[in-house]
Amino acid sequence: MNKFNVYAAWSTLCVSLVFPSVSKAGQYTNFDVSIYIPVGVVQSFENPQKLADDWARISRQLKVDKVYVEVQRNRQEANDQLLEQVKKFFLAHGVKVAGGMAASDGSIGGQFKTFCYTDPKDREFIKSAAELAARHFDELIQDDFFFNTTKYDSDIAAKGDKSWTQFRLDLMDDVAENCIIKPAKAINPKIKLVIKFPNWYEHFQGLGYDLDKEPKLFDGIYTGTETRDPEITDQNLQQYESYQIIRYFDNIAPGRNGGGWVDTYSIRYIDRYAEQLWDTVFAKAPEMMLFEWSAMLRPIRAGERTNWADLRTSFDYNQMVSAWSANAPAGLEPSVARVAGYSLEQVDSFLGQLGRPIGIASYKPYQSTGEDFLHNYFGNMGIPIDLHPEFPTNADLILLTECAKFDPDLVAKIKSQLAAGKSVVITSGLLRALQGKGIEDIVEARYTGRKILARRYLSSFGAGNGTVIGDEQASDVLFPEIDFLTNDSWALVRALAEGRGYPLLIMNRYSKGILYIWTIPDNFNDLYRLPVEVASALKNYVMRGFPVRMDGPAQVALFAYDNHSFIVESYLPVATDVRISVAGGKAKLRNLVTGEILTGQPDNAGGRGGMDDEPRMRFNAHLLPHSYAAFAGEP
């Protein structure tokens, strides 16, 4: 059985990851890199020497293909002469130039405030800003403030009997068309208009972001992949979202998702910034946008990384600084731009060997909510997710969370999948939402509303004794209770509370297919507290037939591709061991960075109840903190 340390993946890169020379665009093989320049920074370029000095410092550390020059933010506008001056500078340096604007109107104590789009003066201001951009640029991106928060008297009167969600959807569709698109194209018919959607996609519709109509109104979309710190921020976004949201938006606007956008905010250690960049391009984003120019010039703060500071992790801080010091002019310290450059140069060396991203098909209808962001917790458990805005009928197995309830025809679609011999996994939240709406015609299981606190677990398949799995000293987890009919449904994984078993995964045969019900903890973070053996028992069914699988602790993600390549990435602050299982006759794994060949052993894990009989090979991996490894399967 082979074992390796992830730091070996970077040993051959150390020589090449050194201080880059000042250069023109087109330096990356698998993606472009761009920087967004807010209007306040643009105005500082009234002094042309500052622009030249900034560019000299940034371009020494980072290969830049494109910049986005902002024309307006918080009612602060750049003038025509300055915009032309800045544009000409970058074009002269071989850098592509686009415009940007932010429809923000300041804040109230840090709480975002938008324009009031029922106020004719605000509408006219936004229109004039779009026209300003159109006079100077052939592309314009809307920063992620293109939503509405105001509930002024004029808004209340215009809303009438509509819900706030419907009112704001209609309002922002109108603003997009009549205050941005038509005015800009009247000035510059060839301008490409792009809307950047932020990271809080579960709640878009409530503030007027329309994932259904706006991608059709605009020429392109862009994706906010900034997940920052999952604990200290108010959003608590999970790391996997930096990858998953790109894939979801790719499925919304195939071929028109321009890239991912990451900032430097709310991180406790510098590795977290690198992880957001990596995960964005692991999803095959064509462009990596860095927000923003002045942040690239700030000193690097390594942060709270003492536990792994001396390890050869994927973001090898010491190696980065050492390589810089050996090549940089005396006294010139690296800035955040070098962190971005170092991180992106690493992954650019192997991304071209990865195929098309794949995952477990899942479904989030337009304008839906329910079990918000749960898909990203699945991703952090090592379950790759491929999220779609339309029901993915071609998938052999579909994983449905509560948000799918917004499809009025959902039960009929589930029946069709099962009748076709396919499998459907629904969460306990979706079961609760579908009670009384037809789910009983498939399975008579019930979300009771009662709760159980458990720390012991069993697995089984048919009648008889179950097998104890996991550490009996595991943490307590609070689950909802699901009732089912004995012998109609079967509990595959159970939680034990004071000697009584409660189902965590139920299977029910319907027509030619199988319906599974997955009981989700009240606190999604408790998914990470499940013993490894319990998570593995769940994956036996949820990932049935998937070509690659990773078993190990939570907060280790798996990114899979359609050419038998994959990446495993740990977000943990400690080293960890994982087991990898691959199908498709792949007896070896080739490290895509070092070329090392790993030879596997037959995977006789069993425990799948005869549900997954395809031969598989297993490999062991040792991952250092906040590190990843990339592989391709070979015969």
Task: Write out the residue ranges for each language-model feature.
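Aromatic-lined substrate-binding rim segments of carbohydrate-active enzymes
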Residues: 71-106, 159-187, 405
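A conserved amphipathic helix/loop scaffold
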Residues: 375-376, 402, 406-635
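Short, acidic/polar
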Residues: 43-61, 119-133, 203-214, 269-280
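Active-site-adjacent "subsite" loops/lids of carbohydrate-active enzymes
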Residues: 28-53, 81-138, 148-152, 178
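Active-site groove signature of glycoside hydrolases
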Residues: 61-73, 125-166
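Catalytic domains of carbohydrate-active enzymes, especially glycoside hydrolases
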Residues: 50-74, 132-141, 221, 277-291, ...
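The substrate-binding groove and active-site-proximal loops of carbohydrate-active enzymes
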Residues: 37-45, 68-77, 109-127, 160-174, ...
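Hydrophobic targeting/anchoring helices
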Residues: 110, 138, 144, 149, ...
